[in-house]
């Protein structure tokens, strides 16, 4: 299952001076309706223009169809205008915030007297459909002066603020202003040409509201004006819009499946983890069943790291603030850290300070502490590459509005390692690390990757430009040699060095950032790290930061959604459950389970008072990969019957064969769910 595909770029069309772009597109034979109808054009400078645009000179433009990313974005922006018109018709007191297109949809913010209800959304959808059916025309109008704009929008305080801040706004979600002109888009009655409604907007827009063939309002929520909690409280309505009903249905099906797979929902249903209010936002606890999965993940990771030559270390959760002054985190990452704890201060009886205290911080990253381990004694080139690894707990102050389940938390455990090597070893270490990353992800059934190269943020970095350029070029070379698609991420690097991140697609086609590999020449300098080279000179090591899971919590959440809670048998908290047809046959299954447990399998017998069919239903809902049933014939034959997650069943399997099948399947770390097919001759091993 994936999102609808986008059409390929169209051939260029010549637009004569004095002719509308829409006329030229029609005369070139492009479709006038359907999902590939042209909704805007792109000029030679890459700017999107309305079809009503009339160039002063002959130009060539690229038609942009509705079923492209840009086409959908324009449709969604226009749908946001239709939503705003509907809201102001139903709630005349509503004041307009902003209404941009976003990934797969749009939203609009409003100042209203109360939150929107589901009934409000249903009523607004009906009004929007009426507006769309009326085929209102979007008409761009340049406002001659700031004074004229202020006068026209005098009753819209948020729009007035945008007008006043016009020159200082750099936010892609603010569509109201931009460029050298102030423009308003009027919605015109197609019969009379009279203005029905209008909004401050830089555009572009579709020709008419009838170019919105499919839309749906999805939800509402609270919001802050311009995302700042110190600003006015607003109400936000989200929606989605597409080039066809079929594309929208496909998207809504994807959303419904994503909701069914939501790891927060499954975490509760499968008793894996929870988020107690008593602990605070972004601080999960893992229950016994979730703890089993987490332990399996960590144990397998340790095994693989030993095979790759890593050495295990452990560091504390808090440190004196000076450490993060040296590393630069307090200068460049303070907003992502929890506030300082001022401790160890001693006072005299009169309240004066006898012994000054010190600021301690929860660690946001492990790298400074690993540097102290490297620096704890002299190092020789013979020790390099030195690969230090730990499951390090770190704490980051994420704003409450962005905390989300396990995928965005405030306390997390990283499978974190730092590699110290010579410059001569650097490229091979990077290449080896990248292959290690990809191999480990494949071991968990994630094998659809691309790479992202995050480069220097010119406003937030330490070190020399030349050093950054060398590090970036080296990472790019290693990434390109992997054969994977490489996507640039300008300005996305941490302050101390560029990074490669592995982007993974899950079963629904969604992209998740997983592993990161960062090259760092700067922290070794700041910590004065040295090793003795083979010629006796002191040299700086190169430092490579890498986390393969990213964090245990995030990886756990992604895996939960990827497998919809039906974890591979080797990860499943309960791998086998015995279900007797009647209580009389339970002892037979207890004997089988005893053998499985002795072989290291997590097995149990469902000894509840429920009837057999209810037990099958319950354990299927708990997504147990192997259910072993036993009735009179099974007991008599020394056999069991297999039942699988998909409902398939194989009867009368001898117990010795059943134990072998289960243990071999788990031992091979198969990621697919077992089915009846695996018991066919030649399939089970």
UniProtKB/Swiss-Prot annotation:
GO terms for biological process, alphabetical: threonyl-tRNA aminoacylation
Function (record text): Catalyzes the attachment of threonine to tRNA(Thr) in a two-step reaction: L-threonine is first activated by ATP to form Thr-AMP and then transferred to the acceptor end of tRNA(Thr). Also edits incorrectly charged L-seryl-tRNA(Thr).
Superkingdom to which the source organism belongs: Bacteria
Entry note: cofactor: Binds 1 zinc ion per subunit.
Protein name: Threonine--tRNA ligase
EC number: 6.1.1.3
HAMAP family: Thr_tRNA_synth (MF_00184)
Enzyme class, spelled out: ligase
Keyword match Transmembrane: no
InterPro entries: aa-tRNA-synt_IIb, aa-tRNA-synth_II, aa-tRNA-synth_II/BPL/LPL, Anticodon-bd, Anticodon-bd_dom_sf, TGS, Thr-tRNA-ligase_IIa, Thr/Ala-tRNA-synth_IIc_edit
Residue numbers binding Zn(2+): 367, 418, 545
Quaternary state and interactors: Homodimer.
Major place of residence: cytoplasm
Domain TGS positions: 1-65
Family to which the UniProt record says this protein belongs: Belongs to the class-II aminoacyl-tRNA synthetase family.
Span list, region Catalytic: 262-568
Listed cofactors: Zn(2+)
Catalytic activity: tRNA(Thr) + L-threonine + ATP = L-threonyl-tRNA(Thr) + AMP + diphosphate + H(+)
Signal peptide feature range: none
GO cellular component: cytoplasm
GO molecular function terms listed in the Swiss-Prot or TrEMBL record: ATP binding; metal ion binding; threonine-tRNA ligase activity; tRNA binding
Zinc keyword on record: yes
Cellular compartments annotated: Cytoplasm
């Amino acid at each position: 299952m994936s999102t609808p595909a986008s059409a390929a770029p169209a051939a260029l069309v010549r637009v004569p001076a004095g002719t509308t772009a829409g006329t030229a597109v029609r005369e070139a034979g492009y479709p006038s309706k359907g999902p590939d109808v042209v909704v805007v054009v792109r000029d030679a400078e890459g700017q999107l223009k309305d079809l009503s645009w009339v160039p002063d000179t002959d130009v060539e433009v690229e038609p942009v169809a509705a079923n492209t990313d840009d086409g959908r974005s324009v449709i969604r922006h226009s749908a946001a205008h239709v939503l705003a018109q509907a809201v102001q018709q139903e709630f005349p007191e509503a004041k307009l915030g902003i209404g941009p297109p976003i990934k797969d949809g749009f939203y609009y913010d409003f100042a209203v007297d109360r939150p929107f209800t589901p009934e409000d959304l249903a009523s607004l959808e009906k009004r929007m459909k009426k507006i769309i059916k009326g085929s209102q025309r979007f008409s761009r109008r340049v406002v001659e002066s700031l004074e004229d704009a202020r006068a026209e929008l005098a009753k819209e305080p948020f729009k007035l603020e945008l007008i006043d801040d016009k020159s200082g706004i750099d936010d892609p979600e603010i569509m109201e202003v931009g460029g050298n002109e102030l423009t308003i888009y009027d919605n015109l009655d197609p019969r009379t040409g009279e203005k029905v409604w209008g909004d401050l907007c830089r555009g572009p827009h579709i020709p008419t509201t009838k170019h919105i063939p499919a839309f749906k309002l999805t939800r509402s929520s609270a919001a802050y004006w311009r995302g700042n909690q110190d600003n006015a409280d607003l109400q936000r309505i989200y929606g989605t819009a597409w080039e066809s009903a079929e594309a929208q249905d496909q998207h809504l099906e994807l959303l419904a499946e994503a909701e069914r797979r939501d790891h927060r929902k499954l975490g509760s249903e499968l008793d894996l983890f929870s988020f107690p209010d008593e602990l605070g936002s972004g601080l999960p606890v893992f229950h016994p069943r979730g703890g089993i999965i987490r332990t399996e993940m960590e144990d397998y990771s340790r095994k693989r790291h030993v095979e790759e030559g890593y050495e295990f270390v452990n560091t504390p959760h808090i440190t004196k603030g000076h450490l993060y002054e040296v590393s630069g985190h307090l200068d460049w990452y303070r907003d992502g850290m929890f506030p300082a704890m001022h401790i160890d201060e001693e006072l005299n009886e009169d309240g004066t300070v006898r012994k000054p205290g010190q600021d301690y911080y929860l660690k946001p990253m492990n790298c400074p502490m690993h540097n102290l381990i490297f620096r704890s004694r002299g190092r020789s080139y013979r020790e390099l590459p030195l690969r230090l690894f730990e499951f390090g707990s770190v704490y980051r102050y994420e704003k409450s509005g962005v905390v989300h389940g396990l995928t965005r938390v405030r306390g997390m455990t990283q499978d974190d390692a730092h590699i110290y090597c010579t410059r001569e070893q650097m490229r091979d270490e990077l290449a080896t690390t990248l292959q290690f990353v990809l191999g480990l992800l494949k071991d968990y059934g994630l094998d659809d990757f691309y790479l992202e190269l995050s480069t220097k943020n010119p406003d937030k970095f330490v070190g020399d430009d030349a050093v950054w350029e060398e590090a970036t070029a080296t990472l790019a070379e290693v990434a390109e040699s992997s054969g994977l698609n490489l996507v640039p991420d300008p300005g996305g690097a941490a302050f101390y060095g560029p990074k490669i991140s592995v982007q993974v697609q899950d079963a629904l086609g969604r992209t998740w950032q997983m592993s990161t590999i960062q090259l760092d020449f700067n922290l070794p300098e700041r910590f004065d790290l040295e090793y003795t080279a083979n010629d006796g000179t002191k040299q700086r090591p190169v430092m490579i930061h890498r986390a393969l899971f990213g964090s245990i919590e995030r990886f756990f959440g992604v895996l939960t959604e990827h497998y919809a809670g039906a974890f591979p048998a080797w990860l499943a908290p309960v791998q086998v459950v015995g279900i007797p047809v009647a209580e009389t046959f339970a002892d037979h299954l207890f004997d089988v389970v005893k053998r499985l447990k002795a072989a290291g399998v997590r097995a149990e017998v469902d000894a509840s008072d429920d009837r057999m069919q209810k037990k099958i239903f319950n354990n299927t809902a708990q997504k147990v990969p192997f259910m072993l049933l036993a009735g009179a014939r099974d007991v008599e034959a020394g056999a069991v019957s297999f039942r699988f997650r998909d409902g398939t069943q194989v009867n009368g399997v001898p117990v010795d064969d059943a134990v072998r099948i289960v243990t071999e399947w788990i031992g091979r770390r198969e990621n697919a769910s077992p089915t009846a097919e695996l018991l066919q001759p030649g399939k089970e091993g």
